[in-house]
Amino acid sequence: MDILKNRNFLLLFLGRIFTNIGDSLYYVAAMWLVYKLSGNPFYSGLAGFLTLLPSALQFLTGPFVDRWSIKNTLVITQVLQCILILIIPITHYFDLLTVQLLLIIMPIVAFIEQFAYPAQSKALPLLLHKTQLLKGNSLFSFAYQGIDLICTTLSGILVALLGAITLYVVDSLTFAITALLFFSLRMPKQTETGTSLSTKQYFTDLKEG
């Protein structure tokens, strides 16, 4: 496929795949770990709610993503997710892991995702010719839906075989790999310069969509 010969698109596409793998592994491992630590289905339900809630707030991130450097946004979001996810196995190792800590980290990681995915979508038309956008979007849809379905299905098996903590270590590794892939991107110069965003301008941009 010719589109995959485009170095920048390939890096972005691979990053998209690893991001989705990381998100899927994290969600299933988190649900399982919360229940294991608490033994209470209420906390599992609360964890699911807190993880899904930020996706309803994605529209609030748009004005920031539109102004920030795409490459910086892509890299920083992955680094932050990597660090936050890694806190889980580290605190577990020192016997400091609690349900409360998980319930704090989960929505933060999920909220960071709301900056990562729009930035990826915004980068796509900057890296592809107009004639390649349809193929590019199709591959991105596969990476988002197909990989998510596969990984969510396999995550339950992996949790049973490896344990949630090991899965968190693998998960943090996927975000680290993605950060390196995005760091290697060569974005057009004009996308590397962000502008400040006043409160008034933020709400104006939010209203305009």
Regions found by a protein language model. Name each.
Residues 1-9, 188-209:
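Juxtamembrane intracellular "pre-TM" segments in multi-pass secondary transporters
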Residues 7-8, 40-43, 67, 97-99, ...:
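Membrane-helix interface segments
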Residues 10-27, 50-65, 69-84, 101-159, ...:
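Substrate-agnostic recognition of the 12-TM MFS/MFS-like secondary transporter fold
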Residues 28-53:
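Extracellular/periplasmic helix-loop-helix junction of adjacent transmembrane segments
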Residues 35, 87-92, 109, 182:
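MFS-fold secondary transporters
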Residues 39, 62, 91-96, 163, ...:
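Short helix-capping/hinge motifs at transmembrane helix termini and TM-loop junctions
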Residues 79-96:
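C-terminal ends and interior cores of transmembrane alpha-helices
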Residues 95, 122, 126, 168-200:
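Helix-loop junctions on the cytosolic side of multi-pass membrane transporters
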